[in-house]
């Protein structure tokens, strides 16, 4: 099981557009529920911790069978049910501290920006939480060691979209907001995340940095993994890669979204003051 020699490769535009065209031809683009039968079959190969919303992980003997994790063995982490999407009206907005506010359809994103593909690992920030709970009980999904996977993500660079929008002086953070609807503590709100502008713009020898991804392992994103578009932030925990992306906001401060301000932090006692003072988890901690 050898990894590919190059961590990233650019896609031929005809191939890229071919994916979208083929999907539209069979009705997948506007009807994500077409995936439902396949996803139901795939879920039987996962250890399901919750069905609404879906949270599931593969058995480790399945996970290690290939370098590129098949969708059927890729963990699913959701805080809300899969939202319904109509591509005819769907738009991603880019706003905040930008020179030009943008409103882009999926077709405009794939037509106007260079397509790229990167192999990147995704892992849940709560990976192996069940092991921690053996020592001290921790709330949340009691994950084993399976919520981690390695996939080929295809899409466009976030940096290219931000370049078109133009960053204003003082811009330091980029927020991502989903179109899902999380119900928690009597409130309804979208899942969200934010990363630094520096992380958003980076391009290293390991790859092209943060992506707005529309494909996974060479095929359109399945609904459980963010159809029609999501962010992929290599090197960061999965909580910073937002599925079902609908809004990007450039700001001078981190997002105030619950999952940045009040969750996915490392705390000891867990009282409100400690939660408020703790910094959000970003980089994936190496463990064995």
Feature roles, as predicted:
Residues 1-11, 15, 22, 26:
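N-terminal secretory signal peptides
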Residues 19-21, 37-38:
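Short, intrinsically disordered, low-complexity terminal segments
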Residues 37-288:
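Structured, non-membrane catalytic/scaffold regions adjacent to prosthetic-group chemistry
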